[in-house]
Amino acid sequence: IVAAHTAKVMVNDFLDTKKMAFPRFFFLSNDELLEILSEGKDPLRVQPFMKKCFEAVQKVEFTERVTMKTIVSVEGESVPLCKEIDPAETGAVEKWMLEFEDVMKASLLKVTRESVVSYTTKPREEWILDWPGQVVIAGSQVHWTKEVTDAIVAGGLKEYGEKSNVQLTNIVNMVRGELTKLERATMSALVTIDVHARDVVVQMSADGVHDPKDFKWLAQLRYFWEDDTLKCRMINAQAQYGFEYLGNSARLVI
């Protein structure tokens, strides 16, 4: 009995070291973690546990050389990794899982950067269809923040409210048209965001907001692309966007 207890304590201590090396292992039971560690040299057999560590990741696509190349969401959306990951080269499972986490975030950062830059190069309705749903929401909010700020300074909130109505109508018309399941999910989420954004602008116009430092504007969740990253601000609080992949799920709240 003593020997069995000692062995159990040693196993738990061993698993704790793995969890500390890759904290997302805390989402797994000890039995699941033991199974992952036993299969760690074969990433294809670890695949079923990816979703428990990364909620939006249904699976990862591999190359013929068994390097990780693409994230696939629960909804079937694909996002290419900015760098292929070779689990065999990295070694221990917690090390290549940690590398996957870093590369996932770097990939979302890269795609978001590209989307923000390309926003002004084509009609918004076309731009929306070029990017993953999460990136569309983030990129759109960056430009909304800038455009509303410019409208406040120029005294053009009323006109921007009218522009917001036109944009919203265009998106609703697209939702009613022929779209793929993923495109429709992106559009539906964007409608929720755009309705809220329109209402904010209309209310600020009615309240006579004319200063970007007005509390009514500062109290809104605003997105900024600064220092090559995405920052979110509200009143005097600021947080960096985490670039955790969220998939293309519905947005119930802003």
Describe the function of each predicted region.
Residues 40, 253-254:
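Conserved mid-sequence domains
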Residues 4-57:
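Amphipathic alpha-helical packing elements
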Residues 47, 51-253:
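Extended, charged/polar low-complexity intrinsically disordered regions
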